[in-house]
Amino acid sequence: MAMGTRYAGKVVIVTGGGRGIGAGIVRAFVESGAQVVICDKDEARGRAVERELPGTVFLLCDVTREEDVRTLVSETIRRFGRLDCIVNNAGYHPPPQWPEETSAQGFRQLLELNLLGTYTLTKLALPHLRKSRGNVINISSLVGAIGQSQAVPYVATKGAVTAMTKALALDESQYGVRVNCISPGNIWTPLWEELAASTPDPTATIREGTLAQPLGRMGQPAEVAAAAVFLASEATFCTGTELLVTGGAELGYGRKAGQAAPAEAPTTPS
């Protein structure tokens, strides 16, 4: 693997780094010269990435457990003596469900992972990031801004991640710490494939996901990863930003009502 210098000598923690977007982010930072700590609660996946990529260290960690996260940060500092960037990528998108099918317990569990896991690592990492004038990168989602059918809990958690990013950026600017987020659209990952498989017609679901972008394809984890390295390195005048990596899925003006919705003709005001 060719090693770059864009982020040489820096130390990065990536949560959910065992597969999908997270693994892509780990790879991109390694290629940029950084030392990367892979955080994942799935040991087999994390170890596989560690074996593949020299310059990485895997630490077993469930971001919903604060003691795990404390150990993650302290062990990173013990091994490397510094911390320059955290990428809060760990998260989950449940299968489609209507609001009446959701439970308060399921909603809380998703909040613990998608939102509070991000908050906990950020809080515990900030003393070290302030020393290095480092940065925080949160992985949010396009649907946190534009909504998504049958995904109320997920949309709520990701909208909160984006809002938290902006608030943290204000608080941490006095220490020179930059806080930004990336909001991906449809990125082809194992999780996307699993979600499609849970629908009545996976092939049709994948086709719809592909055609949602004007570019006519889904994104790749490497494209989100490139955005993360950019925010950590060259984007030195960016904080509180939401960087969309969506293939333009949010663009345009089109049909929203379903087939069964009555098509009412507009009336002219009297």
UniProtKB/Swiss-Prot annotation:
So where's the catalytic machinery, residue-wise?
Y154
Keyword hit for Plastid: no
Q: Does the keyword field hold Cytoplasm?
A: yes
Q: Can you supply one Gene Ontology CC term for this chain's record?
A: cytosol
> What is known about the tissue distribution of this protein?
Detected in retina.
Record CDD domains: RDH_SDR_c (cd08933)
Enumerate the subcellular locations listed in this protein's record, separating them with semicolons. Answer: Cytoplasm
The Swiss-Prot or TrEMBL record annotates one GO molecular function as: estradiol 17-beta-dehydrogenase [NAD(P)+] activity
Q: Which residues bind NAD(+)?
A: R19, I21, D40, K41, D62, V63, N89, Y154, K158, I187, T189, L191
Reaction catalysis annotation: L-fucose + NAD(+) = L-fucono-1,5-lactone + NADH + H(+); D-arabinose + NAD(+) = D-arabinono-1,5-lactone + NADH + H(+); L-galactose + NAD(+) = L-galactono-1,5-lactone + NADH + H(+)
The record's Gene Ontology biological-process terms are: L-fucose catabolic process; steroid catabolic process
In what pathway does it function? Carbohydrate degradation; L-fucose degradation
Q: Which UniProt keywords apply?
A: Carbohydrate metabolism, Cytoplasm, Fucose metabolism, Lipid metabolism, NAD, Oxidoreductase, Steroid metabolism
| Family matches, as NCBIfam families | PRK07231.1
**What role is this protein assigned?**
Catalyzes the NAD(+)-dependent oxidation of L-fucose, yielding L-fucono-1,5-lactone, which rapidly converts spontaneously to L-fucone-1,4-lactone. Can also act on D-arabinose and L-galactose, with lower catalytic efficiency. Does not use NADPH. May be the initial enzyme of the putative L-fucose degradation pathway in mammals.
Q: How does it assemble?
A: Homotetramer.
The family classification in the record reads: Belongs to the short-chain dehydrogenases/reductases (SDR) family.
Specify the protein name: L-fucose dehydrogenase
- What organism does the UniProt record list as the source? Bos taurus (Bovine)
Q: What is the lineage of its organism?
A: Eukaryota, Metazoa, Chordata, Craniata, Vertebrata
